[in-house]
Amino acid sequence: LIVIFPEKYGGTVWRDGAEGKRPETNILKELLPYLEKQYAVTGDRRQRTVMGFSMGAAGSIYWGAKYLDLFSAAVALDAGGGTSFSDPKARNYVPEYGKKTEAIRKSLKLRLVQGALNTRKFRESLNTLKIPYDYVQLPRDISAYPAESSCLNKKDLTKKFLHNPACMTEGKWGEQTWSFIEKGTHRKEKQ
C-alpha cells in the first residue's frame, strides 16, 4: 500500500506551471517512478491512495480524478472552499469530475474529512454528478474531544483547533480514514 501525501508546494494548487513550479512532474512523473525502480514500490493503482491536508487536500481531490491510472482512492483532510468542476476561475478547478464522471464513479473511492473549512459546494457538485463519496464532519461540540486531543487549542482548551493534520487523523475519524484507505485499495494476498 502506498499513500502519496501532497503537502507544502506553495502557490501551485498541485498543478504544473503555477509560478514556474512542477509538482505533478516532480512527484508523479519523476519521484514516483524512481521509488518504483529503487525500492520495488508497486505500480498497481489498486494499491495507491492520494491523501492531503488543506491545500494538499485540494491536491488529492485534483490528482485523484486526473490520475485515475495512478490512484484508487483519494482522501481530502479539511480541504478549503473553492473546489469546482465547472468554474475555470475557481481556486481549485477540477474539470476532470465533469469530464470523467463515469470513470470516477467506477474507479475512485473518495473521502472528505471536514474540520474547520467548508466543502459544501463541492459536495453538492459530487451529489449532482452522482459521484459517491465518504464524508465525515469533525464534532463541533468541544466536549467531544479528550483533553490530550490535537483538536484542542493548547493555549486555550476552551477552543478547538480543527484545521490541523494531527486532529484530522486521530480518534475514531482517523481510524475510519485508515479503514477507508484499506478498503479503497486492494492488497495482494501474502503467499
Q: Model segments located where?
A:
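Non-catalytic cap/lid and distal C-terminal segments of serine-dependent acyl enzymes
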Residues: 1-191
